[in-house]
């Protein structure tokens, strides 16, 4: 009987874990289109956090920065260093783009662990980090693709497209595909890491006391920051390569 009872309890625990759903969405009907409502909601929250923090930090700028102003100046200097290292001396115009990518991804990733999204109940699905949705990460990848196409064309004009037929026109399809697969690989890596991190925490919380998953959550925060840095760094590297023609 003890063995049977243990087996039943084990199966019940597995059944509870199987209730964790992935891919459930809350849709908004806009004309003939279905829009993922929860992604827009969480993205707006992240944008509001970034804009609100920046506004509060620099509303009274000081010659000798302190507090929030000092923190944001440090972040800006860090983003400038990353951009200059990857793009080169012409990095200046691209600092806002790289900085936006880094900060949006960083805050989005951390929001999945630190913000109590589940307090807000939706008719379908649930709120989670924006980067927990493949649509967000693919959109970021497409923005990166558009950025380095723009950078290359701005630098070289229509001569930028000559690289697609070098060293031989036979490689044209492969060269075109390569330009799109590189940023898309970034999007899948980012999506997979954030989704896996949140699923691991959910499963551990359902199996063990709430204290045990804390180390996993801390590790998740660390890896989330690293993922934001990797995405921003490689985006800057692709832009730099597009301008230099060393793809």
Swiss-Prot record:
The chain crosses the membrane at residues 33-53, 95-115, 134-154, 199-219, 220-240. Keywords: ATP synthesis, CF(0), Hydrogen ion transport, Ion transport, Membrane, Plastid, Transmembrane, Transmembrane helix, Transport. It holds the Pfam family ATP-synt_A. InterPro entries: ATP_syn_F0_a_bact/chloroplast (IPR045082), ATP_synth_F0_asu (IPR000568), ATP_synth_F0_asu_AS (IPR023011), F0_ATP_A_sf (IPR035908). GO terms for molecular function: proton transmembrane transporter activity. It comes from the Eukaryota. One of its GO terms (biological process) is proton motive force-driven ATP synthesis. Its main location: plastid. GO terms for cellular component: plastid membrane; proton-transporting ATP synthase complex. It is found in: Plastid membrane. F-type ATPases have 2 components, CF(1) - the catalytic core - and CF(0) - the membrane proton channel. CF(1) has five subunits: alpha(3), beta(3), gamma(1), delta(1), epsilon(1). CF(0) has four main subunits: a, b, b' and c. Belongs to the ATPase A chain family. NCBIfam families: ATP_synt_6_or_A. This is ATP synthase subunit a, plastid. It comes from Cuscuta exaltata. The lineage of its organism: Eukaryota, Viridiplantae, Streptophyta, Embryophyta, Tracheophyta.
